[in-house]
Amino acid sequence: MKRLLLLAAMQSAILVGAQTRSDGHLFYEDFATKNNFSVNWTVTDANNDSKTWEYIDETSSPDADGGTGLAKYLYERNNAADDYLTTREPVTLKTGTHCLSFYYRTSTTRNKESMEVLYGKSKDFSTMK
């Protein structure tokens, strides 16, 4: 068994769906409320450009899985993103038993956007795979 800290390292604008539930998921987050975002996630602005992850309740534009709450990172044209959205508590995944799945979308189809999901045994981003 590995103790994994789930992390999304952003290189562009994305929307990710958040909330712990008792429906068989080891960890499930749909960002239904701002409290979920604050309690379950840590935001790190590693390049200190003040452009980083934030919670948005956007009823006019549903998120990737159809809800309205989302974690959003806005594209910064002049500075490559180096920002992290990490689970506050480690999530333990058992090899061959658990899998990671998530929804995300970009805000435009004009520019290619990318996202990286990292995992590791500590909160030190440089040690994550």
Locate the predicted segments by residue.
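Hydrophobic beta-strand positions in extracellular immunoglobulin-like domains
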Residues: 33, 89, 104-106
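Beta-strand signatures of extracellular beta-sandwich domains
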Residues: 114-118
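Short beta-strand segments enriched in hydrophobic/aromatic residues
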Residues: 73-75, 104-106, 119-121
